[in-house]
Structures are given as structure tokens and as C-alpha cells.
A protein has these predicted regions:
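The feature captures the short pre-catalytic strand/loop hairpin that immediately precedes
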Residues: 3-8, 133-142
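Soluble non-cytosolic domains of exported or imported proteins
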Residues: 14-22, 65-75, 149-150, 176
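Short, solvent-exposed turn/loop segments enriched in Gly/Ser/Thr/Pro and often Arg
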Residues: 41-51, 98-104, 178, 201-206
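C-terminal cap/loop subdomain of S1 sulfatases and analogous C-terminal strand-loop tails that border
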Residues: 104-123, 140-148, 153-213
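Loop/turn elements at helix/coil->beta-strand transitions in domains of secreted/extracellular proteins
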Residues: 35-41, 90-96, 129-130, 194-197, ...
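Histidine-centered active-site microenvironments of extracellular/periplasmic hydrolases
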Residues: 51-54, 60-70, 83-139, 151
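Formylglycine-dependent
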Residues: 1-38, 45-56
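Beta-strand elements within well-structured catalytic alpha/beta cores of enzymes
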Residues: 27, 38-44, 71, 78, ...
């Protein structure tokens, strides 16, 4: 197992228990050194994906075993990153998006997708419908909820619009991604139809397929 930064191996092997801490430290350093100009930070934590191993300082701190320990640390690390945005006076001018990529792992203690059927690798909603939290103080009202049909492919055109970026001017003749701008929906704008009125298609790991409309 190797841990890379750009094209350089920085740890071999690496300690899987400390990855969330390492990623957060790197992210905070990036924010601190990039604060003078607009920046984009993509932070794909590996936790709580398998293999689930708790940080030594977080071991046995939850009431839900090692999975709970890992999630509690993840919550803490995200809080550290949000605190950094506040300390650097970037909180009001930074869009934060947090989401999962799929439903829970089957056949594990924490494998619950209630009230939906299906889990990871399934085309049912328990495998494909995931939480997504968006924070942008002053533009997105805190505490609002939406059940609108949104896909991860909608993030690029939505965030580009929010940042005043015309994707067509940057595509150099190539087709713009199929995603849609759902910014009005995220802002809770009434009277504006939700942009995604078409369908989404998924295929499950067992060959099962589904269309969501």
C-alpha cells in the first residue's frame, strides 16, 4: 500500500487508521495557502469505506463499534475544515458540498438504508439515493430540505453558474457535460421549475436496471 502526493510516494506502507487525519491536514493547508484567490478543493475521504479501521485516538469512542468510531472522527475532521474557513474569513464566500457516492455496504452491521429498499451495488433507491448537504451562508437558507431529483453530474454546471462561469466558453468546442444547473432549487427559489425533469438510469451489480423519473 502506497500513499502518493502528485507523482511522489510519501508513505509505503501507509497507516490506514490515520488517512482521515492526513487528508484533513492537507486540505487545511491548501485552504490556508490558497485563501488569497478563488480555489476549488475536492476532498474524497476514504472513510468509512472498507477496510474500516479507527484512528487510535478515536477507538472505542462511539456506541456503534469501529464504524461509529470512524464516522465520529470524520465528523470532527470536517468540523476542523469548516472552522478553518471561518478563521480565514472565507465562510461566507465558500460553497461547501458534502455527499456520499452510494448506499451502505451489504451484509454489515451498519448496513441500513431505511426507509428505502436496496443497498450498495443495487439500482434500488437504497443503493443510489444518498444524502447531499450544501452550505453557502447568505445564499442558501440553513435547514431547508428538498426531495428534488438531482444527480452528481449536476454539480459542475450548478457550481459553475453559482461562480459566474460560462462552461461553454471553456469547453473549447467539446460538448458540455450532460448535467443541469439546479442552483435555483438549492436556493429554495419558489416559482422556478426544477431543471431536471428528465429521467436518470442506473444499472445494478446483479444486472438489475432501473429508471428514475
Amino acid at each position: 500500500r502506497e500513499l502518493w502526493r502528485d507523482d511522489e510516494v510519501i508513505a509505503k506502507p501507509f497507516d490506514n487508521r490515520r488517512l482521515t487525519e492526513i487528508f484533513t491536514t492537507e486540505a487545511i493547508e491548501f485552504v490556508n495557502t490558497s485563501k488569497a484567490r478563488p480555489f476549488f478543493l475536492y476532498l474524497p475521504f476514504t472513510a468509512p469505506h472498507f477496510p474500516v479501521e479507527a484512528h487510535p485516538e478515536w477507538k472505542d469512542r462511539s456506541q456503534f463499534g469501529v464504524f461509529g468510531d470512524v464516522v465520529e472522527e470524520l465528523d470532527h475532521r470536517i468540523g476542523q475544515l469548516l472552522d478553518t474557513l471561518k478563521e480565514q474569513h472565507l465562510e461566507e464566500n465558500t460553497i461547501v458540498v458534502f455527499l456520499s457516492d452510494n448506499g451502505p455496504e451489504p451484509l454489515t452491521r451498519e448496513s441500513r438504508a431505511d426507509p428505502f429498499r436496496g443497498k450498495k451495488w443495487s439500482a434500488l433507491e437504497g443503493g443510489t439515493r444518498v444524502p447531499c448537504l450544501v452550505r453557502y451562508p447568505g445564499s442558501i437558507k440553513a435547514g431547508q430540505e428538498s426531495a428534488a431529483l438531482i444527480s452528481a453530474i449536476d454539480l459542475l454546471p450548478t457550481l459553475a453558474h453559482a461562480c459566474g462561469i460560462d462552461l461553454r466558453k471553456h469547453s473549447k468546442g467539446s460538448p458540455v457535460i450532460d448535467g443541469l444547473n439546479v442552483w435555483p432549487t438549492l436556493r429554495g427559489k419558489e416559482g422556478i421549475p426544477h431543471a431536471r425533469q428528465d429521467l436518470l438510469y442506473w444499472h445494478g451489480g446483479d444486472g438489475f436496471q432501473a429508471i428514475r423519473m
